[in-house]
Structures are given as C-alpha cells and as structure tokens.
Curated annotation (Swiss-Prot):
<comment type="similarity">
    <text>Belongs to the succinate/malate CoA ligase beta subunit family.</text>
</comment>
<dbReference type="GO" id="GO:0005829">
    <property type="term" value="C:cytosol"/>
</dbReference>
<keyword id="KW-0479">Metal-binding</keyword>
<comment type="function">
    <text>Succinyl-CoA synthetase functions in the citric acid cycle (TCA), coupling the hydrolysis of succinyl-CoA to the synthesis of either ATP or GTP and thus represents the only step of substrate-level phosphorylation in the TCA. The beta subunit provides nucleotide specificity of the enzyme and binds the substrate succinate, while the binding sites for coenzyme A and phosphate are found in the alpha subunit.</text>
</comment>
<feature type="binding site">
    <location>
        <position position="264"/>
    </location>
    <ligand>
        <name>substrate</name>
    </ligand>
</feature>
<feature type="binding site">
    <location>
        <position position="213"/>
    </location>
    <ligand>
        <name>Mg(2+)</name>
    </ligand>
</feature>
<feature type="binding site">
    <location>
        <position position="46"/>
    </location>
    <ligand>
        <name>ATP</name>
    </ligand>
</feature>
<dbReference type="GO" id="GO:0005524">
    <property type="term" value="F:ATP binding"/>
</dbReference>
<dbReference type="GO" id="GO:0006099">
    <property type="term" value="P:tricarboxylic acid cycle"/>
</dbReference>
<dbReference type="InterPro" id="IPR016102">
    <property type="entry name" value="Succinyl-CoA_synth-like"/>
</dbReference>
<keyword id="KW-0436">Ligase</keyword>
<dbReference type="GO" id="GO:0004776">
    <property type="term" value="F:succinate-CoA ligase (GDP-forming) activity"/>
</dbReference>
<dbReference type="InterPro" id="IPR013650">
    <property type="entry name" value="ATP-grasp_succ-CoA_synth-type"/>
</dbReference>
<feature type="domain" description="ATP-grasp">
    <location>
        <begin position="9"/>
        <end position="244"/>
    </location>
</feature>
<feature type="binding site">
    <location>
        <begin position="321"/>
        <end position="323"/>
    </location>
    <ligand>
        <name>substrate</name>
    </ligand>
</feature>
<keyword id="KW-0816">Tricarboxylic acid cycle</keyword>
<dbReference type="Pfam" id="PF00549">
    <property type="entry name" value="Ligase_CoA"/>
</dbReference>
Length: 389
C-alpha cells in the first residue's frame, strides 16, 4: 500500500526527521489559506498522487502569492494528473500539499528496500539526488552506495557515518545524516514498510540536511497490525477493477491486451500469460483466484474481466490440487449463466477430478471450449479472440 507524500512526511515528523511545514488542502480556499498558516512569501505546491514524475507533468510549482496557490489548486483538484508512471488516464488529484520553500544547495538520494536475495533491509544512498534512481542504477551503478542491515543487530551508527563520509558530508551534516538514517531504519521496521525513498534529501544553503520528498510503500500482508496506516489508504489511486478484486481476495492487475485470464495460483497465472503471448495473443489481465476458488469468487472474477471492454475472449486455466476441478467447473458454469458471457470462453482443467470437471462442462450445453492441454488452450483462445473460433 502506497502513501501520499504528505502522509509520508507526517510519519517522518513522528520519527523526528527534518521535513518542511506543510498543509494538505482539499479545496482551493483551503490551499490559499495555508499560506497564511505557514508564513513566508514563497511556497511550493504539489499535486498529491501515487506516482513519480509530477514535476515534469506540471504537478509541482513554486509560487509567490495566495492567488497563484488558488489558481494551481483550481487547475488540479478534481482532475487527473498524467505522468510517465501512470497510464494515459492518469491519477485523480484530491489534495494539494502547500509547503514552505527550502533553499537547496545540493540534492542527495536516500532510500531503503527489502532485498529478496539477501533477505535483509538494504539502505541505498547516492549523490545523484532528484533524478530517478532506476536511471542511476542502470547508467552509473557505481554511484549507488549500500548498507545492509543485520536483522538481529539492527541499523548501526557506524553504517550511517560510513555512508555520510562517502557522500561527502562533513561536520554537523554527518550527525544529522546518522539521526535520519537511524530514524528511517526504526520506522521501516516498526511500520512494516516494503520501501521508502527520500528523493531528494537536500543540503540547504545553511548546510543542514532536509527531507524534501517522501515515498513510502507498506507491506500489504502486514496491514492487519498497522490499523493507523490502513486508515491512510486512498482507494481513488487504484484501478477500480483492482480495488474491487481486492475486496474478494482476488489478485488482479489490468494489462493492455484483449484476452482475459482467470487462473488459480500466481505462478500458473504468469505462465499462462507467457504462453498466450507466445502464441500471438495479448493478455488483458493477470488474475489469480487463489486456492479457494468458490462459485461466488469465480462470478466476481468474470465480472471484473468483462468490465474491460477490450476483452474479446477469456481463458480459464485451473490446476486442481486442494480445489476439485468438478467444483470449479460448476462455478464456471454458474458464473457464465449469471453474468451472461457473450464472448468465447476457453477452459483448461488439470489435476484433482479434471476428467469429471471436463464432463460437467461438456454436459452443460454452454458454449465453453474445452482445451486438452495448456498449449491447446492458448492456441484456442488466441483463435477465438481473433474471431476464428
């Protein structure tokens, strides 16, 4: 689960990290009045969306009057911001963050992530702040410094000092960096984070370190023990179909193709998309119905797939382990009848009671194409999507 920048900075402040004073406004009037609350004569206004690249898209602006703040808020509130990280529809803007201005001398990068290969939290730092870290990693990987956190010992001050020296920090900046590093490490563990980034972490004209941005991603599997963070969830930033799928414990990700896929198991779902692509098709989605695929969940899965108007055929690929294929077949039949599916449906069943499941489908009288193998299923659904079935 992602947080907005203003929410991330609230967390930073709780852990004693240096952040700008700011107000998250929901109306143009609130945004304009924020200038009086914050004081000063120059402010930064930022559209709040779960995407990077806001500055290049016009979603971040330096302003010098309340009128400019109000104009910016009117421009973006209720509209969608399109950046290189969003689709063509963009993300809806429901809040504007108004912040005090910071004089910048140098931009750095500081972030942390769970590294699956080492099974450790890894901190990354770089002198190349203010640009996409992925670009730095690709073009100049030697400029990314790392500190691996031992899960038993935790983050250590010497690791922070080592990074600070390599970043070229000196004097009081080393102490400030150490405090920021240890605060972030504590927050990462206590709040069950999966990723955090400060890009940029700046050195001000006065020589102090300051967190100018905040990107935070929380481990969705740990939200049950983070009720306060769960309340920060903004469903408007998610694809409507993905949000609906989550309510039914379905793992759904929208893609750009025209072949809907319904599969049990994430690995099989990825393999299914690969083989559809191999045979010339374009998957419209990733959809994992999970191990406990009931008729109700299959019905909802169909509804979600068919809500994508670009879908011209559906491939159901089920491997029966704990779940019996005959029960899945009954669920598919019930779903097709209830939803009123008008497009071709190809179904491949393997495993527990697969033969019985195939018989149930054959006896249903519905136009469901039974596949004998995964290759056959992919070939059939690609043909059907092209109208050759």
């Amino acid at each position: 689960m992602n947080l907005h920048e203003y929410q991330g900075k609230q967390l930073f402040a709780e852990y004693g990290l240096p952040v700008s004073k700011g107000v998250a406004a929901e109306t143009p009037a609130e945004a304009a009045s924020a200038a009086g609350i914050l004081g000063g004569d120059t402010w930064v206004v930022k559209a709040q969306v779960h995407a990077g690249g806001r500055g290049k898209a016009g979603g971040v602006k330096l302003v010098k009057s309340k009128a400019e703040i109000e104009e910016f808020a009117k421009q973006w509130l209720g509209k969608n911001l399109v950046t290189y990280q969003t689709d063509e529809n963009g993300q809806p803007v429901s809040r504007i963050l108004v912040e005090t201005c910071t004089d910048i001398d140098q931009e750095l990068y500081l972030g942390a992530v769970v590294d699956r290969s080492t099974r450790r939290i890894v901190f990354m730092a770089s002198t190349e702040g203010g640009v996409e870290i992925e670009k730095v990693a690709e073009e100049t990987p030697e400029k990314i410094l790392k500190a691996i956190i031992d899960p038993l010992a935790g983050a250590q001050p010497y690791q922070a000092r080592d990074l600070a020296f390599k970043l070229g920090l000196e004097g009081k900046q080393i102490k400030q960096f150490t405090q920021i590093f240890l605060g972030l490490a504590k927050m990462f563990k206590e709040k069950d984070l999966a990723l955090l980034e400060i890009n940029p972490l700046v050195i001000t004209k006065e020589g102090d370190l300051h967190c100018l941005d905040a990107k935070i991603n929380i481990d969705g599997n740990a939200l049950y023990r983070q009720p306060a963070l769960k309340e920060m969830h903004d469903p408007s930033q998610e694809d409507e179909r993905e949000a609906h799928a989550a309510k039914w414990e379905l793992n759904y990700v929208a893609l750009d193709g025209n072949i809907g896929c319904m599969v049990n198991g994430a690995g099989l779902a990825m393999g299914t998309m690969d083989i559809v692509k191999l045979h010339g098709g374009q998957p419209a989605n990733f959809l994992d119905v999970g191990g406990g695929a009931t008729k109700e969940r299959v019905v909802e899965a169909f509804k979600i797939i068919l809500s994508d108007e670009s879908v011209s055929a559906v491939l159901i690929n089920i491997f029966g382990g704990i779940v019996r294929c005959d029960l899945i077949a009954e669920g598919v039949i019930g779903a097709v009848e209830e939803v009123g599916v008008k497009i071709p449906v190809v179904c491949r069943l393997e495993g527990n009671n697969a033969e019985l499941g195939a018989k149930v489908l054959a006896d249903s009288g519905l136009n469901i194409i039974a596949a004998t193998s995964l290759t056959d299923a992919a070939e059939q659904v690609v043909k059907a999507a092209k109208g050759d079935a």
